[in-house]
Amino acid sequence: MTALQALYREDFDHGRAIRLWLYVVAALVFAMVLVGGATRLTESGLSITEWQPVTGALPPLNEAQWQMEFQKYQAIPQYRQLNAGMSLADFKTIYWWEWTHRLIGRVIGVVFFVPFVWFLWRGWVPPNRRAGLWMILALGALQGAIGWWMVASGLADRVEVSQYRLATHLVLACLIYVAVVWTGTRWEDERVQPLLGKLYRTAQTMTVRAGAIGLMLLLLAQIYLGALVAGLRAGHAYNTWPLIDGGLVPQSSQLFFEVPLWRNFFENPLTVQFDHRMLGYAIGLLALLQLFNVVKLVKHGPVFASVLLVVAAVIVQVALGIWTLLSVAALPLALLHQATAMITLTFSVIHAAITIPPKVSARTEPSLQ
């Protein structure tokens, strides 16, 4: 083995270690989103009424501490208006959901920060990659603050958190997830990076690239709408399909009665659910169009495989969405619907990441496969 080959092998091993680290972080973010969904659906998110990033890592350890936490919860409107008479045992159930959600957030911070500092110290992170990783770390810190900002909205004058803040919290989590998966997928040397290949500058390939990015962005928008649906409990109304409020398209007087007009898109349960349905149909059509465009270029290889996964996931997700609606947002189906949304987003990120080739150097010739 030559010195150059040994150096390349060492760099490749470093890259493999960093990719593994990023995929572990992504798995933890995925888990946190699901636990966050369960916390929301079980209405557990207001059970911890304080934000203590360090000392809050420990749960109540004795009966006196549990009673103290319960008394804090009893002082907020949600308890007085919705859960008056709740037993301590029932309170513990909702408390553990929220505590677990926050604990995973703390674990993510440690799992990201400690190896990141180690990789930097060892010189394993190329200079052109560092800014992206620092940005992910900054977004993670911001997410903790936004999580408390969301919880705080339900502690004084409401019995639930603001749907605006809930949607912001979820979408930022998804943006962090996208950034981590994207970075891990593309953390490869040009010689092993899967590409569309020599056609990457043609109109057809640029169409595929645009379609991949478009799908990913629409899925993020759909997740935002899904959060509004959850925040407004819109999944507990208009539980028919394909009709909604008695028609394929509701009457405009019902869709747009809020003033000013823009509020309907965020505060009117009918409008929010209708938008969520329509965007789901649009994503399904775009996924099929993307498959058609990819097949015109390649019929095997990573790009083809990834678009098949996207299409399959979208179809399953649409079916699950309908089933969840008809079940009046039954908890197991609602959680499965959220999990499948994250899986669909994962496939779309991978598909987009491998359709965009790295810079081509003189030593590198992209492969169509």
Annotate each PLM feature.
Residues M1-Q369:
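Polytopic transmembrane helical bundles with strong interfacial aromatic enrichment
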